[in-house]
Amino acid sequence: MVTDTISDMLTRIRNANMIKHQIVQIPATKMSKAITNILKEEGFIEDYEIYMENSYQFLLISLKYKGKSREPVICKMVRVSKPGLRVYSKSKKLPKVLDNLGIAIISTSKGVMTNLKAKELGIGGEVLCYIW
């Protein structure tokens, strides 16, 4: 059993990107659905769909590549807040990822969102990961 579903999700996507898989399968949780939705909105993945198998829900994520050499759109994914060490940030001190070329995914009281949207709304929260 996986204790940190977010790290597991990021690792599965990172591994699939390295070997240039088109689709990756991830166990569906509320958090993984929210993060996947943000990745789609921000253009890091093509699409995703939810499917059932033996009463378990899974996410099928279609990864996005650019050019003929199929370079992954996602260059790096870094887990920030971990179960052993939570990292929180106030609205005025939300991190910038590569001068806003990347995103930070923040878990706030209003839901999971990017650092830019959280800054817009003036709320802070737990910094889950950086993606660029």
UniProtKB/Swiss-Prot annotation:
Record PROSITE patterns: RIBOSOMAL_S8
InterPro entries in UniProt: Ribosomal_uS8 (IPR000630), Ribosomal_uS8_CS (IPR047863), Ribosomal_uS8_sf (IPR035987)
GO terms classed as biological process: translation
Keyword DNA-binding found: no
GO cellular component: chloroplast; ribonucleoprotein complex; ribosome
Pfam families given in the database record: Ribosomal_S8
Broad class of the protein's primary localization: plastid
NCBIfam families reported in the protein's UniProt record: PRK00136.1
Protein task: One of the primary rRNA binding proteins, it binds directly to 16S rRNA central domain where it helps coordinate assembly of the platform of the 30S subunit.
Subunit record text: Part of the 30S ribosomal subunit.
Name of the protein described by the UniProt record: Small ribosomal subunit protein uS8c
Organism: Trieres chinensis (Marine centric diatom)
Gene: rps8
